[in-house]
Amino acid sequence: NAVPQTPTAKTDAKNAIDQAATDKKNAIENDPALTRQEKDAAKAKVDEEAKKAKDAIDAATTNEDVTAKQTEGTQAINAVPQTPTAKTDAKNAVDQAATDKKNAIENDPALTRQEKDAAKAKVDDEAKKAKDAIDAATTNEDVTAQKDAGKDAINAVPQTPTAKTDAKNAVDQAATDKKNAIENDAALTRQEKDAAKAKVDEEAKKAKDAIDAATTNEDVTAKQTEGTQAINAVPQTPT
């Protein structure tokens, strides 16, 4: 009977390497932080490490060498990095865009404190949406597209001083209503109507100047209320 010549040590070691490579590639494939390109690159690196390990096993001359090369190969396979650089870089770019936009908002003198805070909160909201979209992207191209879309959305957050504009519009409307009432007051002479309407315009200007100088929504509202009251208090007295 022939003595069997079965290289079980090397075969078992290479099978173990193949299993380690399969397990690592499965982990890479199922890593949601990696893009398609990052997964493919990492799995190619695993295949490279597996080949090196099996070549080293084939070159080994003792069971101890085989075991050592199997161990080294398994460690090298498991050490292949799963680093989501594309998504990390994209999210860092979104964070920088958000920081720049919030600085611009904070330094805008036309905005009230509340408008600044609301605009900055909107920036944070757009940044979060962008980063969530980046996390959900599956390719480098998707990541770049979501990064660019997020930066555009952040930069598009309006810096519109609506509180002051609305307050001044309300003062203008109060002035218009008051002047209409004066004009339609049959008890007043032409000169009395003109004098009263000039006083209304004066009060409206004072109110709008005060609104422009306000720094908070509360200040704006207070100046609007004071101005409207002053306009409505202009007398319609037929002397």
PLM features: residue spans?
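Thr-biased low-complexity repeat/linker tracts and other Thr-enriched repetitive architectures
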Residues: N1-T239
